[in-house]
């Protein structure tokens, strides 16, 4: 069933789930600090994205849950090889299905799921829009995705015993992005705010916000290890290179628009610029959409999910 679901998702949204291989490992667990682990998925993996987990003295926090329950169960099994401590929290870095599809596995394990407030509102409805032609059973899977139990607005600190984990709202890839910072290990889980040598999905992006977010991450974490949403682990230099890609993309599109180029001319000129500069990046098939989405954004015509009206108390 999930194969059909992923196929629809790939066509409709071009999430990076193409070229799935039945014999490819779903992910590799890498220890990147004391009690800090990244689950890195190859492009051909059925996991669909990267994830990770952090172990403290009183429990475990998981960052993202992959695209479906099967790889999420594999991640749970890997955690159990490392520790028997309870899985207390899951952080969804944003609402996209490739990072939230396994929430149910960890909810059943007793975890509290936390995300930015926009994720709570968008997780089902906005993922559902990617499946307009799906069968009822497939749509039901999206409609039953496990929602976050806790929704925050700007920042929240989580303690696993004495271990501090900082969850911060930093928009760009979507309007509901979170990063998870592990100060004592100098590690930042960036979700899809960071694509390591891969062209990103811009379907919900505000590239102006994204560039500012990446600049703040570089300034605040100049020596950190970054866990990307797609691709391998990233260094501060890698984050800077990804930032520079977004700047190159925006500047190239803006320049072509100012020159009055047609959509076809704009796409051709910017595509040539990008392909020359980023020859070794993955997901080259995303380049045309990156250009189209950025052009729409700069024209003020791009449609992205609308943030819900805040609920005020008395």
Mark where each language-model region is.
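Divalent metal-coordination and catalytic microenvironments
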Residues: 35, 54, 64, 79, ...
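Conserved beta-strand hairpin/beta-sheet module of binuclear metal-dependent hydrolase folds
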Residues: 30-78, 179-191
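Bacterial N-terminal signal peptides
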Residues: 4-18
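Short acidic-hydrophobic surface loop/beta-edge motif
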Residues: 30-32, 54, 156-160, 226-228
């Amino acid at each position: 069933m999930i194969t059909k679901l992923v196929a629809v998702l790939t066509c409709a949204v071009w999430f990076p789930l193409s070229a799935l291989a039945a014999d490819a490992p779903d992910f590799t667990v890498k220890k990147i600090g004391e009690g800090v682990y990244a689950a890195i998925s190859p492009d051909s993996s059925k996991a669909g994205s990267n994830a990770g987990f952090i172990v403290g003295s009183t429990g475990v926090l998981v960052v993202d849950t992959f695209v479906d329950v099967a790889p999420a169960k594999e991640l749970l099994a890997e955690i159990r090889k490392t520790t028997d401590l309870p899985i207390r929290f899951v952080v969804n870095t944003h609402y996209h299905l490739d990072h939230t599809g396994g929430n149910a596995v960890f909810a059943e394990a007793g975890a509290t799921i936390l995300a930015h407030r926009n994720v709570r509102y968008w997780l089902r409805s906005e993922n559902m829009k990617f499946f307009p032609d799906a069968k009822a059973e497939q749509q039901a899977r999206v409609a039953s995705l496990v929602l976050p139990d806790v929704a925050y607005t700007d920042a929240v600190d989580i303690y696993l015993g004495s271990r501090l984990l900082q969850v911060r709202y930093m928009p760009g890839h979507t309007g509901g992005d979170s990063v998870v910072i592990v100060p004592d290990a100098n590690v930042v889980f960036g979700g899809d705010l960071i694509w390591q040598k891969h062209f990103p999905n811009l379907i919900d992006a505000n590239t102006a916000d994204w560039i500012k977010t990446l600049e703040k991450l570089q300034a605040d974490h100049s020596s950190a290890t970054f866990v990307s949403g797609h691709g391998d682990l990233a260094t501060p230099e890698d984050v800077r290179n990804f930032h520079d890609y977004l700047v190159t993309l925006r500047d190239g599109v803006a320049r072509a628009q100012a020159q009055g180029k047609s959509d076809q001319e704009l796409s051709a000129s910017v595509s040539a610029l990008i392909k020359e500069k980023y020859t070794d990046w993955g997901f080259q098939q995303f380049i045309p959409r990156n250009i189209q989405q950025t052009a729409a954004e700069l024209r003020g015509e791009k449609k992205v999910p609308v943030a819900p009206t805040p609920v005020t108390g008395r």
